[in-house]
């Protein structure tokens, strides 16, 4: 299977950016890998370690409220949501996936702050493992690119 062509920005520069990360602890093996890949990519893009604030919440449904608290402080240039929702035998998967995603999007629009949504939704653990590193790094690139874009538009 071929991956989607995501395109790449010319040059991403995170040197002056402050980034907030909210990571769900549920499925921590996956979310820890997402966070590690995300932070490594932020550093590679020039974001200073001291300008990265990372917090953890119990699960994906709690991510939006922590993002909101960060957005209200008006200290961050971009935020990143990290989580992993694996389909189970109940409707709960759809509820958590839909509500966490809607919350992240609403906050980005309400606060006019870029939020890279790397709350991955998968059918099984194998899919989560296959996506964890790539999606974490993708989230970092999205956050830096969108922070720079919104700065240029203001």
UniProtKB/Swiss-Prot annotation:
In short, the EC number is 2.5.1.78
The domain of life for this entry's organism is Bacteria
**Active-site residues from the entry:** 92
Known catalysed reaction(s)?
(2S)-2-hydroxy-3-oxobutyl phosphate + 5-amino-6-(D-ribitylamino)uracil = 6,7-dimethyl-8-(1-D-ribityl)lumazine + phosphate + 2 H2O + H(+)
Which GO terms of type biological process are on file?
Answer: riboflavin biosynthetic process
Any one GO MF term held by the record is: 6,7-dimethyl-8-ribityllumazine synthase activity
**Residues bound to 5-amino-6-(D-ribitylamino)uracil:** 26, 60-62, 84-86, 117
Q: Which UniProt keywords apply?
A: Riboflavin biosynthesis, Transferase
| Pfam families per UniProt | DMRL_synthase (PF00885)
Cellular component (GO) terms are: cytosol; riboflavin synthase complex
Q: Identify the residues that bind (2S)-2-hydroxy-3-oxobutyl phosphate.
A: 89-90, 131
Q: Which InterPro entries match?
A: LS (IPR034964), LS/RS (IPR002180), LS/RS_sf (IPR036467)
Q: What does this protein do?
A: Catalyzes the formation of 6,7-dimethyl-8-ribityllumazine by condensation of 5-amino-6-(D-ribitylamino)uracil with 3,4-dihydroxy-2-butanone 4-phosphate. This is the penultimate step in the biosynthesis of riboflavin.
Which HAMAP family does the protein's record reference?
Answer: Lumazine_synth
UniProt similarity note: Belongs to the DMRL synthase family.
Recorded protein name is 6,7-dimethyl-8-ribityllumazine synthase
